[in-house]
Structure formats: C-alpha cells, structure tokens
C-alpha cells in the first residue's frame, strides 16, 4: 500500500512538465530559440548597474553641504554689529551739553547785585 502511494505523486509531476515543454516547442522550433538568448542578456546588465551608482552618490553630497554653511554664517555677523554702534552714540552728546550752560549763568548775576547797593546807603544817612 505504501509503495503504491509513493509512485502516484512521482508520476504526476513528470507528466505535467512533459506536456508544457512539448507544446511551445512543437509549432515553431527554430524561432523561439533565437530570441530567447538575446533577450535575457541585454536587460540584465544595464538594470543593476544604473540604479546602484547614482542613488547613493547624489543625496549624500548636497544634503550635508548646504545647511552647514549658510546657517552659522548669517546670524553671527549682522546681530552684534548693528546694535552696538547707534545706541551709545546718541544719548551721550545732547544731554550734558544743554543743561550746564543756561542754568548757572542767569541765576548768579542779578541776585548779588541789587540787594548790596540800596541797603548800606539808607542806614548811614539817618
């Protein structure tokens, strides 16, 4: 019984394979033999050669080169240069120049000149 079961599946596969091979070779035996060798030879060479070279070469060069140069160069130059020049130059010139000239000039001249002349002149005559 066991030997009969083993023979059944073994004879089935070879029968199926023989039918498939005999069908395409019977009608045109010379035609399918010539294009079958030239076709699989051409597409197998340029396919794996082209996508394997330009893929890892293009994205690895422009990515780390562009963002590393313009970032640290722009914000470090215009920031400390503009606010350090116009700020301390304007408030230090007009403040100490105006209030120191007109104040001590008008108040010290008319006061000591009027009360010292009429007072000692009236008391000595009586």
Curated annotation (Swiss-Prot):
Tissue specificity: Suprabasal layers of squamous-differentiated tissues such as epidermis, esophagus, tongue and trachea.
A Gene Ontology biological process term: keratinization
Region (2 X 12 AA approximate repeats): 3-29
Residues bearing PTM N-acetylserine: 2
One GO CC annotation: cytoplasm
Induction: During squamous differentiation of epidermal keratinocytes. This induction is repressed by retinoids.
Protein localization: Cytoplasm
Domain of life of the native organism: Eukaryota
Keywords: Acetylation, Cytoplasm, Keratinization, Repeat
Region (11 X 8 AA approximate tandem repeats): 31-122
Sequence repeat placement: 3-14, 18-29, 31-38, 39-46, 47-54, 55-62, 63-70, 71-78, 79-86, 87-94, 95-102, 103-110, 111-118
Sequence segments annotated as region (Disordered): 20-43, 104-126
Family: Belongs to the cornifin (SPRR) family.
Function description: Cross-linked envelope protein of keratinocytes. It is a keratinocyte protein that first appears in the cell cytosol, but ultimately becomes cross-linked to membrane proteins by transglutaminase. All that results in the formation of an insoluble envelope beneath the plasma membrane.
Name of this protein: Cornifin alpha
Organism: Oryctolagus cuniculus
Phylogenetic classification of the source organism: Eukaryota, Metazoa, Chordata, Craniata, Vertebrata
